[in-house]
């Protein structure tokens, strides 16, 4: 109480120097006053109360309510003047809470005020919009709703144009970017439309490995238009067109840069045979030297093959009685060649490690290898390599499907030398074509047949699959050359098509065991219980 009375004395001026309503002069201020300074008004205590809104949806808010001080018995005029000069502080509003993702903004005015919008990485995703006034709204996006791009002002576009020009990659050719499959399909459809392929084949064509039939139809139409009456030697028209379709498929995949991991489109390989280097020496697919083995053939006298043998091979064929006392035509070949793994096997029987190569006449087989080598040198005289390679198919119609299982018998097409009858009587001086002279000087051809062929008037050995695949080595090379001509007539650039080199593998071995094969069944349970 004493201190409060002292503060009140300091606010009261001295008597004779002025009243409470008249402020003192400068002289009075300059002179020291023995009274203390006037006391300050005590701060108003504020009481925090919780006010409930009348609206049930709004949440309760906290407001600051000034607490009225308790009345005092005596209050001076100076205290009232000082208290009136102080401004009353307004209660600070509570910051707004962020809206929930359930809020949907659909008004046009709010859309115009949006300055930035982004997509939040949540589940479900939300579209977050920031207005120009600092307002932030959130809208939930459905799966089918398109994501709107952020709206930018013209000034922002001008500022970011330079940065975008540096990061944008421009196609120098100004061409649309397409996939490799679309590129191959476009080229294939152009060929099928031009050469009038069947609509069913065209509609089902998807550039798959097993769809060679549609491309073979293209090659067949092209042959009928450009090379009518094509001469083939020991080759069926169906096999020739099929091999052209395979080569065309390889060019399409190379053009579109489409590859399949476990499928080679041509179904061929280049074999470095080395069978024409040393006289009398032949090598099998293993790369080993083939051994000599006597081979005896017996045919019925009344059969067509027996009569032909008596006529064409009168020096070797003779009529004898077999062990059952019947007259047969017997041909004994002492120059037969077989794989080294078949030395202990009878004629026309092979071991489990054999490559399946067998020649009844080794000399004729070597003449056929010399013919294809001379044919390659005549066709490509300036080639540095490749004259000693043989383009050979690895798949016939039996094992042409991708992912086929090994079957009983030979796994590679059978390689057989065929003699050219009456070719020795031709005068070589009258022929100027070197490719034709290759067959005149070496009158035998290598012919590729089905892996396990079934001849006329004979039964299938082992009951394995068989087909009518048959094509000679020169015609196989001509099929590749004609596909290149077909491609050059329709496209400007010829892609690079690589035929793999042949390497021996255990998957090419002769199979003496027939494995059971399962067939797909749509039923869930095998039996009805």
UniProtKB/Swiss-Prot annotation:
<protein>
    <recommendedName>
        <fullName>DNA-binding protein</fullName>
    </recommendedName>
</protein>
<feature type="region of interest" description="Disordered">
    <location>
        <begin position="1"/>
        <end position="108"/>
    </location>
</feature>
<dbReference type="InterPro" id="IPR036367">
    <property type="entry name" value="Ad_DBP_C_sf"/>
</dbReference>
<feature type="region of interest" description="Flexible loop">
    <location>
        <begin position="297"/>
        <end position="331"/>
    </location>
</feature>
<keyword id="KW-0238">DNA-binding</keyword>
<dbReference type="InterPro" id="IPR036368">
    <property type="entry name" value="ADBP_zn-bd_sf"/>
</dbReference>
<feature type="binding site">
    <location>
        <position position="339"/>
    </location>
    <ligand>
        <name>Zn(2+) 1</name>
    </ligand>
</feature>
<dbReference type="Pfam" id="PF03728">
    <property type="entry name" value="Viral_DNA_Zn_bi"/>
</dbReference>
<keyword id="KW-0479">Metal-binding</keyword>
<dbReference type="GO" id="GO:0019028">
    <property type="term" value="C:viral capsid"/>
</dbReference>
<dbReference type="GO" id="GO:0039693">
    <property type="term" value="P:viral DNA genome replication"/>
</dbReference>
<keyword id="KW-0235">DNA replication</keyword>
<feature type="region of interest" description="C-terminal arm, DBP binding">
    <location>
        <begin position="513"/>
        <end position="529"/>
    </location>
</feature>
<keyword id="KW-1194">Viral DNA replication</keyword>
<keyword id="KW-0244">Early protein</keyword>
<dbReference type="InterPro" id="IPR036362">
    <property type="entry name" value="Adenovirus_DNA-bd_N_sf"/>
</dbReference>
<feature type="region of interest" description="Disordered">
    <location>
        <begin position="125"/>
        <end position="168"/>
    </location>
</feature>
<dbReference type="GO" id="GO:0003677">
    <property type="term" value="F:DNA binding"/>
</dbReference>
<keyword id="KW-1048">Host nucleus</keyword>
<feature type="binding site">
    <location>
        <position position="355"/>
    </location>
    <ligand>
        <name>Zn(2+) 1</name>
    </ligand>
</feature>
<dbReference type="GO" id="GO:0045740">
    <property type="term" value="P:positive regulation of DNA replication"/>
</dbReference>
<dbReference type="InterPro" id="IPR005376">
    <property type="entry name" value="Adenovirus_DNA-bd_zn-bd"/>
</dbReference>
<dbReference type="GO" id="GO:0039687">
    <property type="term" value="P:viral DNA strand displacement replication"/>
</dbReference>
<dbReference type="InterPro" id="IPR037540">
    <property type="entry name" value="ADV_DNB2"/>
</dbReference>
<comment type="subunit">
    <text>Homomultimerizes on viral ssDNA bound to pTP. Forms an initiation complex with viral polymerase, pTP and hosts NFIA and POU2F1/OCT1. Interacts with host SRCAP.</text>
</comment>
<dbReference type="GO" id="GO:0006260">
    <property type="term" value="P:DNA replication"/>
</dbReference>
<dbReference type="GO" id="GO:0003697">
    <property type="term" value="F:single-stranded DNA binding"/>
</dbReference>
<keyword id="KW-0862">Zinc</keyword>
<dbReference type="GO" id="GO:0006351">
    <property type="term" value="P:DNA-templated transcription"/>
</dbReference>
<feature type="binding site">
    <location>
        <position position="398"/>
    </location>
    <ligand>
        <name>Zn(2+) 2</name>
    </ligand>
</feature>
<feature type="modified residue" description="Phosphotyrosine; by host">
    <location>
        <position position="195"/>
    </location>
</feature>
<feature type="binding site">
    <location>
        <position position="396"/>
    </location>
    <ligand>
        <name>Zn(2+) 2</name>
    </ligand>
</feature>
<feature type="binding site">
    <location>
        <position position="284"/>
    </location>
    <ligand>
        <name>Zn(2+) 1</name>
    </ligand>
</feature>
<feature type="compositionally biased region" description="Basic residues">
    <location>
        <begin position="129"/>
        <end position="139"/>
    </location>
</feature>
<dbReference type="Pfam" id="PF02236">
    <property type="entry name" value="Viral_DNA_bi"/>
</dbReference>
<feature type="binding site">
    <location>
        <position position="286"/>
    </location>
    <ligand>
        <name>Zn(2+) 1</name>
    </ligand>
</feature>
<feature type="binding site">
    <location>
        <position position="450"/>
    </location>
    <ligand>
        <name>Zn(2+) 2</name>
    </ligand>
</feature>
<feature type="binding site">
    <location>
        <position position="467"/>
    </location>
    <ligand>
        <name>Zn(2+) 2</name>
    </ligand>
</feature>
<keyword id="KW-0945">Host-virus interaction</keyword>
<dbReference type="InterPro" id="IPR003176">
    <property type="entry name" value="Adenovirus_DNA-bd_a"/>
</dbReference>
<feature type="compositionally biased region" description="Acidic residues">
    <location>
        <begin position="156"/>
        <end position="165"/>
    </location>
</feature>
<feature type="compositionally biased region" description="Basic and acidic residues">
    <location>
        <begin position="1"/>
        <end position="17"/>
    </location>
</feature>
């Amino acid at each position: 109480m004493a201190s409060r009375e002292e503060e009140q004395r300091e606010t009261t001026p001295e008597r004779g120097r002025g009243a409470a309503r008249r402020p003192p002069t400068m002289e009075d201020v300059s002179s020291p006053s023995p009274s203390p300074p006037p006391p300050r008004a005590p701060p108003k205590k504020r009481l925090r109360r919780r006010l409930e809104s009348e609206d049930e949806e709004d949440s309760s808010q906290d407001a600051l309510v000034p607490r009225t001080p308790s009345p005092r018995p005596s209050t001076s005029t100076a205290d009232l003047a000082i208290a009136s000069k102080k401004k009353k502080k307004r209660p600070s509003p509570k910051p707004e809470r962020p809206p929930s993702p359930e809020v949907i903004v659909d008004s046009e005015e709010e859309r115009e005020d949006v300055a930035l919008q982004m997509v939040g990485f949540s589940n479900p995703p939300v579209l977050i919009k920031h207005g120009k006034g600092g307002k932030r709204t959130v809208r939930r996006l459905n799966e089918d709703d398109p994501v709107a791009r952020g709206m930018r002002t013209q000034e922002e576009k001008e500022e970011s144009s330079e940065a975008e020009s540096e990061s944008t990659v421009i196609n120098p050719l100004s061409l649309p970017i397409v996939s490799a499959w679309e590129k191959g399909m476009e080229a294939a459809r152009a060929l099928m439309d031009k050469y009038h392929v069947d609509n069913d084949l065209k509609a089902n064509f998807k550039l798959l490995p097993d769809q060679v039939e549609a491309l073979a139809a293209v090659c067949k139409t092209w042959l009928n238009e450009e090379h009518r009456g094509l001469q083939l030697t020991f080759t069926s028209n169906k096999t020739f067109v099929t091999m052209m379709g395979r080569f065309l498929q390889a060019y399409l995949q190379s053009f579109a840069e489409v590859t399949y991991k476990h499928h080679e489109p041509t179904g061929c390989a280049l074999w470095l045979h080395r069978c024409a280097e040393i006289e009398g020496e032949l090598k099998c697919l293993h790369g080993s030297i083939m051994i000599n083995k006597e081979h005896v053939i017996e045919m019925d006298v009344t059969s067509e093959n027996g009569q032909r043998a008596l006529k064409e091979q009168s020096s070797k064929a003779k009529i004898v009685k077999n062990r059952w006392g019947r007259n047969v035509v017997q041909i004994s070949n002492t120059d037969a060649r077989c794989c080294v793994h078949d030395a202990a096997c009878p004629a026309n029987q092979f071991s489990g490690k054999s490559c399946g190569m067998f020649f009844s006449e080794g000399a004729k087989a070597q003449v056929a290898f010399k013919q294809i080598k001379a044919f390659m040198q005549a066709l490509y005289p300036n080639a540095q390599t490749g004259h000693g390679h043989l383009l050979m198919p690895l798949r016939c119609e039996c094992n042409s499907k991708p992912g086929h299982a090994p079957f009983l018998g030979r796994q590679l097409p059978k390689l057989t030398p065929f003699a050219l009858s009456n070719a020795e009587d031709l005068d070589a001086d009258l022929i100027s074509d070197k490719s034709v002279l290759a067959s005149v000087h070496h009158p035998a051809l290598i012919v590729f047949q089905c892996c396990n062929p079934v001849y006329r008037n004979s039964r299938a050995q082992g009951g394995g699959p068989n087909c009518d695949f048959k094509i000679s080595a020169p015609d196989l090379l001509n099929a590749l050359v004609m596909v290149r001509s077909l491609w050059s007539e329709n496209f400007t650039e010829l892609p690079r098509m690589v035929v793999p080199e042949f390497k021996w593998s255990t998957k090419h071995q002769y199979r003496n065991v027939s494995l059971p094969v399962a067939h797909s069944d749509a039923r869930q349970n095998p039996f009805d219980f």
